[in-house]
Design a protein with these regions (language model features):
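Short nucleic-acid-contacting surface segments enriched for D/E, G, S/T with interspersed K/R
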Residues: 1-3
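Short secondary-structure boundary/capping elements
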Residues: 55-62, 89, 147, 200-201
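P-loop NTPase catalytic core
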Residues: 84-85, 93-330
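P-loop NTP-binding catalytic core
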Residues: 7-78, 84
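Active-site scaffold segments
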Residues: 78-79, 91
C-alpha cells in the first residue's frame, strides 16, 4: 500500500496523479529501501506457538491446540468434505488468533465463496489488523486469480518488514479450479480434467508460508475440499498432500452423527510438534492417540469431547489425561 500526496485531477484524467510518496506498507522510505528480499530470507520450522484456547471455551480450538498445534510460519491445510464445518472452524481460528495475537496482520481470503458467507465473516471478524479480501462465485476466474496474487504479494512485503502475517484461505481447491480455467493449455491433462500447469501458482501461494530466521513469518491455513463427487477436487488434494507441515482432517461421518467439531484426531497432526508443545502437552497428545487405537472413530471422538467438556481448560484436561493413564497402568 502506497501513501502519499495527490495533485488535483485534470479534466481529461480519471484519477489525480501521485506526485510524492510518503510511506509504503505503513513504513517510511528509508526502511523500505533497506528491506530484504522475501526469497533471500532463511525458512525454518515454526517454533513460536499460536495459542488458540480462549476464555470462550471453544472445544474445537482446544482440540486443535493439543492434537494439531499451529505455530507462526505454519503451512496448514484443513481437509474437509462438504458440510463438515470447515468455514466455521476457519472463523473460530480467526477469532482465536485475533484475541490471543492481536499484533499479527490477518488476511482472510475467500475465493469462489457465497456472498452471504462473505458478509458473515466480515461482520464476525473485525480489527485494526484484519483484512477480508474476497472474490465471490459470480466473478470471473481471472478475478479470483488477480485477487489471490495481490494478497500473497502484499503478505510477502509485510514479512520483508519483519511482521508476522497469517492468511486464512477458503479454499485452495477453488483457487486451483480458477487457475485451471485461465492458464494456457500445456497439452497434458491429469485425471478429472486438471491441467498440471494450473497447480503452479496455487503451490507458490501455499509454499510461501514459512517462518523466517531473520524475523517475520507467513502463516497460511487453507481449506481443501474432498469427497465432493468431483475427481478434480480429489486430484488437487492429492497434489497438495504432503506439501504442508500441519493437517487438520474433518470427517463427514462424525458431522452426520451431529458430533461437532467433526475432527478426525487420528488423521490430524503437525510436523515437529515437539517445537511447539510442552512435554506435558506432548505426552497428553500421545496418550490420546494411543487410547484411540482400536476403538471406533465415532466412540473415541465422543469420549474425548466429553472429557474436554468436563474440563475448563487444556491445563486441567492434560492433568486429567495424566491421571487416567496412571490409573490404567496400575
Amino acid at each position: 500500500f502506497v501513501t502519499g500526496r495527490v495533485r488535483e485531477k485534470r479534466e481529461n484524467e480519471k484519477f489525480g496523479a501521485l506526485y510524492y510518496v510518503d510511506m509504503v506498507n505503513g513504513e517510511t522510505l528509508d526502511k523500505v529501501l533497506q528491506r530484504p528480499n522475501f526469497e533471500e530470507l532463511t525458512p525454518i520450522f515454526p517454533n513460536e506457538r499460536l495459542h488458540l484456547e480462549t476464555d470462550g471455551h471453544s472445544t474445537a480450538m482446544r482440540i486443535v491446540d493439543i492434537v494439531s498445534p499451529i505455530g507462526k510460519g505454519q503451512r496448514g491445510m484443513i481437509v474437509s468434505p462438504p458440510k463438515a464445518g470447515k468455514t466455521t472452524l476457519l472463523k473460530e481460528t480467526a477469532k482465536a488468533v485475533l484475541k490471543n495475537n492481536p499484533e499479527m496482520e490477518m488476511i482472510i481470503l475467500l475465493i469462489d465463496e457465497r456472498p452471504e458467507e462473505v458478509t458473515d465473516i466480515k461482520e464476525a471478524i473485525q480489527g485494526d489488523n484484519v483484512e477480508v479480501i474476497y472474490s465471490t462465485f459470480d466473478e470471473l476466474p481471472e478475478h479470483h486469480k488477480r485477487v489471490s496474487e495481490m494478497v500473497i504479494e502484499r503478505a510477502k512485503r509485510l514479512v520483508e518488514h519483519g511482521k508476522d502475517v497469517i492468511i486464512l484461505l477458503d479454499s485452495i481447491t477453488r483457487l486451483a479450479r480458477a487457475y485451471n480455467m485461465t492458464v494456457p493449455p500445456s497439452g497434458r491433462t491429469l485425471s478429472g480434467g486438471l491441467d498440471p500447469a494450473a497447480l503452479h501458482m496455487p503451490k507458490r501461494f501455499f509454499g510461501a508460508a514459512r517462518n523466517m530466521r531473520e524475523g517475520g513469518s507467513l502463516t497460511v491455513l487453507a481449506t481443501a475440499l474432498v469427497n465432493t463427487g468431483s475427481k478434480m477436487d480429489d486430484v488437487v488434494y492429492e497434489e497438495f498432500k504432503g506439501t504442508g507441515n500441519m493437517e487438520l482432517v474433518l470427517d463427514r461421518k462424525l458431522s452426520e452423527k451431529r458430533i461437532f467439531p467433526a475432527i478426525d484426531i487420528t488423521q490430524s497432526g503437525t510436523r515437529r510438534e515437539d517445537l511447539l508443545l510442552s512435554a506435558d502437552e506432548l505426552g497428553a497428545s500421545y496418550i490420546i492417540r494411543k487410547e484411540m487405537n482400536g476403538m471406533r472413530k465415532e466412540d473415541a471422538v465422543e469420549q474425548i469431547l466429553n472429557l474436554f467438556a468436563r474440563t475448563k481448560s487444556n491445563e486441567e484436561f492434560i492433568e486429567k489425561v495424566g491421571k487416567i493413564r496412571t490409573n490404567y497402568n496400575r
